[in-house]
């Protein structure tokens, strides 16, 4: 109990950019549609990573590839990040066999705008993370998942 409290209270992550934007986006997804949190994250995370990747954060995404998937560390940050996203997608959709698109689960874009606005509501209209996301950005990421 003590360890889980420390793991989840956010104190240890102070000053470090987090994936909280993606989690907030998925909570909206599973609140509206019949999809589990884990499956929603599996569909969202690769598209979210592609959307938010830039020259300032590509090295962090590349680290996912080298540390989790054993990808070549000598690749450029951008190339390593792209390969990491591909490896993550392959794991979710080929290895685990999960449906890879929201449309595979009968989900359409009907509620995307409301979901995006709800995801940002408590944070002043913007989700913070690798990059700040507005409701317009979130709708685009949801659409990438169709």
Predicted regions and their residues:
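Active-site segments that bind and position negatively charged phosphate/pyrophosphate groups
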Residues: 1-87
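C-terminal charged capping/lid subdomain of soluble metabolic enzymes
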Residues: 61, 67-146
């Amino acid at each position: 109990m003590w360890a889980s409290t420390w793991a989840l209270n956010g104190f240890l992550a102070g000053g470090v950019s987090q994936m909280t934007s993606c989690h907030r986006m998925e909570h909206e997804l599973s609140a509206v549609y019949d999809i589990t949190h884990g499956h929603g994250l599996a569909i969202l995370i690769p598209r979210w990573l592609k959307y938010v990747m830039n020259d300032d954060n590509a090295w962090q995404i590349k680290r996912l590839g080298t540390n989790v998937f054993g990808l070549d560390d000598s690749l450029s940050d951008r190339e390593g990040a792209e390969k990491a996203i591909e490896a993550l997608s392959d794991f979710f959709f080929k290895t685990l066999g999960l449906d890879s698109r929201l449309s595979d689960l009968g989900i359409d874009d009907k509620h995307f705008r409301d979901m995006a606005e709800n995801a940002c509501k408590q944070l002043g209209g913007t989700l913070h993370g690798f990059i700040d996301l507005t409701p317009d950005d979130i709708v685009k990421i949801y659409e990438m998942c169709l």
